[in-house]
């Protein structure tokens, strides 16, 4: 009996985590949330993607980064996937906050939902990006802190499917 339950559990697990081919290969667009940011996303295979982004954070400071994500289909909604992954980012506040010259580097996780429209070349997503600042250079000499306030709403034009 335990073997049958285990086999049913494994079959359910494998069916719910199976991946289908990605809905697109490459897209470009913008993110809003932790700044006004340009985003380029490309899939390396059916489930793994790189999101390279850069732009303007609050008060005109510069920011950028790269996220590596693994995508999983949500079987009940065509075109909807969830994703998780990790990455790195930087923020440069030099000169925009008056006397403060601030540079920050962080490592981050990411988790989100992504929807790709079937009939138009558009993809939208929302994500949460908790970040641990591993280097910070400013007048206050703070190091290693948690930033739980990063995330974004993204819209991208699909360049090729």
Question: What function would you assign to each model-found segment?
Answer:
Residues 146-161:
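Outer-membrane beta-barrel "beta-signal"
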Residues 20-63, 160:
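Short glycine/proline- and aromatic-enriched beta-strand/turn motifs that initiate or cap beta-hairpins
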Residues 31-35, 85-93, 110, 129-135, ...:
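Short glycine-rich beta-strand segments
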Residues 126, 131-135, 144, 149:
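Extended interaction regions within the primary functional domain
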Residues 25, 53, 96-99, 138-142:
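Extracellular loop and loop/strand-boundary signature of outer-membrane beta-barrel proteins
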Residues 42-126:
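Gram-negative (and chloroplast) outer-membrane scaffold detector with strong preference
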Residues 102-104, 141-147:
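Flexible, surface-exposed loop regions and adjacent strand-edge segments
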Residues 1-24:
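Bacterial Sec-dependent N-terminal signal peptides
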């Amino acid at each position: 009996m335990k073997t049958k339950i285990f086999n049913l559990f494994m079959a359910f697990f494998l069916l719910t985590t199976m991946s289908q081919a990605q809905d697109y290969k490459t897209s470009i667009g913008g993110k809003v949330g932790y700044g006004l940011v340009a985003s380029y996303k490309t899939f390396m295979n059916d489930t793994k993607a790189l999101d390279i982004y850069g732009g303007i954070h609050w008060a005109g400071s510069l920011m950028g980064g790269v996220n590596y994500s693994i995508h999983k289909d949500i079987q009940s909604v065509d075109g909807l996937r969830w994703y998780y992954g990790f990455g790195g980012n930087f923020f440069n506040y030099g000169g925009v906050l008056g006397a403060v010259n601030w540079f920050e580097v962080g490592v981050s996780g990411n988790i989100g939902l992504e929807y790709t429209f079937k009939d138009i070349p558009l993809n939208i997503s929302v994500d949460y990006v908790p970040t641990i600042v591993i280097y910070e250079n400013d007048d206050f000499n703070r190091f290693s802190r948690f930033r739980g306030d990063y995330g974004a709403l993204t819209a991208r034009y699909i360049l090729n499917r």
